[in-house]
Design a protein with these regions (language model features):
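Histidine/acidic residue-rich metal-binding segments in metalloenzymes
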Residues: 47-61, 78-158, 162-184, 201-223, ...
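Alpha-helical scaffold segments that flank or form the walls of functional sites
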Residues: 1-37, 46-58, 85-92
Length: 327
């Protein structure tokens, strides 16, 4: 976007249109709650966030939408003023979640400290890009755990790829500390599978977080899509069933476990009440033509009815025809 904007190829209206199209795809797929990271700071200031807020306005009665201010580096020390100013502007604009990339910062501890300081001051949630690398020594998740513990701030750590590179004896106590701090971990299979492991042509790592160690420790494990049809992931259709299928295939999860990562676990990470088929529960539901969770993930049926608060907010129908063959 930044390069295209500088070249005059894409402007505000085009950004708004693209975001609306993405939200339409999500809603049609059955998504009634979404969190998206928007670059804030540096040369873009809050322009992308302004476009996202405008695009989301027409969808807010159909789905819950919150934006993360993914703050440019650095967030502390020399050169941080412009980024922190943009972050404060984003907070004024109403961004719900504060984010950053501590593992890419010159001082990860100061970055995480600043994020939690602002989150506490402005009563915001925290969602950080954490350790998106195959380097097992990159463990800024420890900083996130330390600041999250006892803070009362709803905290999410996305990616956490390096955890998947650790031996069991090292990852187990770390996973237990994540669970104790009530930090949700988000695996992002589409983008992590595409980006990670390019320097390892033999026995290429999958680039996913330590899925089973985290689950065994009681961590709230979530799965998301991250990028869709951009330079970081050329494909992707904004369909949670695609994400769940990758968690089954690449993460060796059972279908019911994978489905939880895109549904109930995701709502928990967002601070939303759990949904169950009971009187009095939120009627945020998706109806698909499938006889089981496994079948729904495997076939990702196109026919879908999406309900939000008991009202139908999206409906998709598809028809297959097999005309007679002329012989």
């Amino acid at each position: 976007w930044r390069d295209a904007e500088a070249a005059g190829v894409i402007g505000h209206e085009e950004m708004v249109a693209r975001i609306r199209r993405s939200l339409e795809m999500l809603l049609a797929s059955g998504v009634t709650a979404v969190r998206s990271h928007i670059n804030v700071g540096g040369p873009v200031s809050t322009r992308y966030l302004v476009a996202a807020i405008e695009a989301a306005a027409t969808f807010r009665q159909r789905m819950d939408i919150e934006f993360v201010a993914l703050t440019y580096m650095p967030m502390s020390g020399e050169g941080s003023d412009i980024n922190l100013a943009a972050l404060n502007d984003a907070i004024e604009l109403g961004v719900e979640v504060i984010g950053g990339c501590p593992h890419l910062e010159p001082d990860s501890d100061s970055c995480v400290s600043k994020v939690f300081e602002l989150a506490e001051r402005h009563q915001r949630k925290v969602d950080l890009h954490v350790d998106e690398t195959l380097d097992p020594s990159a463990l800024t998740i420890n900083d996130v755990v330390r600041y999250s513990r006892g803070s009362g701030i709803l905290t999410t750590a996305s990616h956490c790829v390096s955890l998947g590179m650790l031996p069991v004896e090292q990852v187990q106590p770390l996973a237990e500390s994540v669970a104790a701090a009530a930090v949700s971990i988000v695996a992002l299979p589409q983008t992590n599978l595409f980006l990670q492991g390019r320097d390892d042509p033999v026995a290429t790592p999958r680039g996913l977080t330590a899925i089973h160690a985290l689950l065994e420790a009681g961590v709230n494990l979530v799965a998301g899509a991250d990028n869709a049809q951009d330079p970081f992931n050329f494909v992707g259709r904004n369909d949670p069933f695609e994400t769940a299928a990758l968690m089954v295939m690449a993460g060796h999860m059972l279908p019911r476990e994978a489905f939880a990562t895109i549904s109930s676990n995701s709502r928990k990470a967002l601070g939303m009440p759990e949904v169950s088929i009971q009187v009095g529960q939120p009627a945020d539901l998706l109806a698909v033509r499938a006889g089981s969770t496994r079948q729904a993930i495997a076939e990702a049926p196109a026919d879908r009815i999406v309900l939000k608060g008991g009202q139908v907010v999206a409906r998709t129908s598809a028809m297959s025809e097999f005309p007679p063959v002329i012989t």
